[in-house]
Curated annotation (Swiss-Prot):
GO terms for molecular function: ATP binding; dephospho-CoA kinase activity. Gene3D superfamilies: P-loop containing nucleotide triphosphate hydrolases. One of its GO terms (cellular component) is cytoplasm. Keywords: ATP-binding, Coenzyme A biosynthesis, Cytoplasm, Kinase, Nucleotide-binding, Transferase. Its main location: cytoplasm. It catalyses: 3'-dephospho-CoA + ATP = ADP + CoA + H(+). Pathway: Cofactor biosynthesis; coenzyme A biosynthesis; CoA from (R)-pantothenate: step 5/5. PROSITE patterns: DPCK. This is Dephospho-CoA kinase. Residues 3-206 form the DPCK domain. It is found in: Cytoplasm. It comes from the Bacteria. Catalyzes the phosphorylation of the 3'-hydroxyl group of dephosphocoenzyme A to form coenzyme A.
Length: 211
């Protein structure tokens, strides 16, 4: 089984690329999904977050107040570091279990869709890394449109991540997502053929869904 790490800057279209891999037959594990799982009400990770950030980080019913926490960490670098120290090990352990289960099920290719793959040190959990590349201005406009942010807030979120140039320098493969969806899909198809020749999956021209 080959585990392929998939990452890129926020607003790069990485989720669309992940869905393209899925349509080709890859098993996709989403770090964002794992991150949501580890902070369910009553979980040890959520308890640690509450101890660090106080009662304001919880909604009335005991769930994580994501809006409050996002505002906090994007304006306070130390808060982000503290949150990462709490959540990254828990996400890594859950990912390890998922990979083990997929290996047991004889999966051929697993794509680990992880926005903070390098920042979290999760590149050590994968066999190779694909970085989705997009021009900064395109990334900025997509992020503003997707999340309803003004330019300053969008740039703040972009700046909170590792610079794209650094990610590209550490990549094994690059998907250029500056063009059309069809051009991006063609790159994914070519990479799949290179990594797992002969792998049979659903129609590679099936529509990918944005995320």
């Amino acid at each position: 089984m080959l585990v392929l790490g998939l990452t890129g800057g926020i607003g790069s279209g990485k989720s669309i690329v992940a869905e393209m891999f899925r349509t080709l037959g890859a098993k996709v594990v989403s770090a964002d999904d794992l991150a949501r799982m580890i902070v369910q009400p009553g979980s040890p990770t959520l308890a640690r977050i509450a101890r660090r950030f106080g009662a304001e980080v919880l909604c009335e019913g005991g769930a994580l107040n994501r809006a409050w926490l996002a505002k906090k960490i994007f304006s306070d670098p130390q808060a982000r570091l503290d949150l990462d120290r709490i959540t990254h090990p828990a996400i890594a352990e859950l990912a390890r279990r998922r990979f083990a289960a997929l290996a047991q099920a004889s999966a051929t290719l697993v794509v680990y869709d992880a926005p903070l793959l390098f920042e979290a040190g999760a590149d050590t959990q994968v066999d190779a890394v694909v970085v989705v590349s997009v021009a900064e201005e395109v990334q900025l406009q997509r992020l503003m449109l997707r999340d309803g942010l003004d330019e300053q807030a969008a740039r703040s979120r972009m700046d909170s991540q590792m610079p794209l140039d650094e990610k590209l320098a550490r990549a094994d493969y690059v998907i250029d997502n500056n063009g059309s969806l069809e051009q991006t899909r063609d790159q994914v198809v070519a990479l799949m053929a290179r990594l797992v020749p002969g792998m049979k999956g659903p129609d590679p021209h099936a529509s990918g869904s944005a995320g």
